[in-house]
Amino acid sequence: MDVEIKEYAGFVQNEWVRGVASLWMTHPGDGAIVLSGDAGCGKSHAVGQLIEAFSRMGFAECVNITATTHKAVGVLKQPSCTTYQSSLMASIDMCQANFEEFKCLFDARHRQAIEMWDRIVSNRTGLAAVKKGHSCVTLNMRCPVCVATIHESIRCTDKPYPYFIARTMFIIDEYGILSELSLKKILYALSKFKLPGQGYILVFTGSVSQLPSPEHPQIWQTPLLRDMIINTYSLFINFRVEDAAYAEAINLFQFNVITRPAVEMLNARVIGANAVDAEYCDSVTRIFNGNRERDAYNTRHTMVMEGRGAGRVDLTPVIEHVGGSASCRFGALIEYMCSTVPKIFNKATKGKRTVYEGGYVFVLPTQERYTFFGLDDVNTAVVGREDGRLYLERQITKYKGWTVSFFPIFPVAAINTYSAQGETLDRVIYAPPEKNYSMSSIRASAYVACTRVRTRTAIELSCNSFAKSVGRTNMFPEKLLNHKKSVEMGYVPRECPY
C-alpha cells in the first residue's frame, strides 16, 4: 500500500473516532452508530483507536467492548472484551428464551442490581455531590466521576452485577449475526439501568455480508435498528489487499455480481478430487458448506494420520456428578454443554475428540490455529506455533450438580463456513456443493470462503459451482443488499431525471 494512501486511511479512522467521541459527549440519549467495511478495511483497528481515545480522556469506565461471538472477541484483542451475552450476564436459559421469558429471567437474576439502581436514581443529586470538587449537579452517565460513583454504589449489592451498567459507549462487533430478538433483549437490559433523559450509544461494527443468524427476523430485517441509527460510516481502504484484482472480484459477490475476472480466476484454481483427498496438502484447512462433508473429510484425515504413525491422543472430558437439590439429569447436562460449547460437545461424542501429535487444532475461545504437540500431564495439553508453545489446562464448567472439565481444543483439518467467518488463513481449500449451489440456504458461504485469503494463489477449489458465468447471482437477499447500501454505505436512492 502506498504511504499516502495508508496515511489517508489512518486520517479517515481518526476522524471517525473524533466524530463518535463528539457525538457521545453531546448526545445524552439513546442512539446507534454503524461502522462497516470489507474484511481488512481496519474496523477492528478503528475500534481499538476509539477505546484508546476514551482511555486517554479518562473515560475508560464509560466503555463496554463486546462482540457477538467468542471468535470475534479474540480478533479484537482487547483485554476487557467479552461477548455481549457475558456483558449482560445472560445465562444459557436467557439466551434461548423468547422475549417475554427473557424479561422475567433478567429481572429475577438481577433483582438486587435493579433495586440498587432505583435507589441510585432517587438519590442521583446527592450522589453527584459525594466527590469534593465535582461540578455535576446530578449524576451524568457521560461523566467518568459520576460513572465511578455509580459503580461504587452498585458494588454494594451482595451478588455480581452486569458489567455494562452505566458504560454508555456500548460497542458490539460482528453485529450482522444479531437477530431482532437479540437486539430487543439488549435494549431491554439497558432500559433497566438508565438515568432520566440519559441513555446508551450502541456502536455496531461489522457487516450483514456474512452467513445469516438462525433466528428470524435478522438484524437487517427489523425497523428497530433503523429507528436507532444516528450515524453510519463505511471504511473503504483495504489494508491487507495483496491481490487487488482478486479482492475486487470477490468483494462484488456482496452485491450479487459475478464478473469475468472472478469466473476466470476461480476456474483456474479448481483442483477437482484433490480437494477432498486427505493426503493432498493435508496441512491446508478445508472449508465445507455442510457438516456431513466436513465430518467425512475429518474421518479420512484421521485414517491418514494413523497410517503415518502419528501419536493418537483421545481427549475425553471428565464429568463428575456432585449432586445437590438442583441436580439435573445427565441428558440435560449434555444438552447444556452442546449449546454452550458446540465446537467440542455433541450428543453423539459427548465431548470426546481424537487429535494427533503434529496435527492442527483450534483453541477456544479465540479459535486460533496451533500445532498439537501432546499432553504434558493428564490436565495439561501442549500446543504451539512458530512464536512458541502454549500450555493449556482443562476448562471447568459447573452446571446443576455436575462438574465438567475438558481441554478447549478441537481438530481443524476441516471446518464449516460458519467456523471460517472471521478467519484469515495462509491457504484454503474450499469444497462447495457441486450441484444446485443457488438452492443452498447458506449461499453466502462462497463469499465467506473466498475472502479468508489475501491472494488468488492461496485458494484452491474442488469445483466452481457458485461463479460459473458472468452476471447476477443470489448469494445475498435483495432486501439485505438494500440495508447494506442504505444503512452501512449511506447510499441515498434517487430517481433518474432522464
From Swiss-Prot:
GO molecular function: ATP binding; helicase activity; hydrolase activity
Keywords annotated in UniProt: ATP-binding, Helicase, Hydrolase, Nucleotide-binding
Coiled coil, from the record: none
Domain of life: Viruses
Known EC number: 3.6.4.-
Binding site for ATP: G37, D38, A39, G40, C41, G42, K43, S44
InterPro entries: P-loop_NTPase
Protein name per Swiss-Prot or TrEMBL: Probable ATP-dependent helicase 25
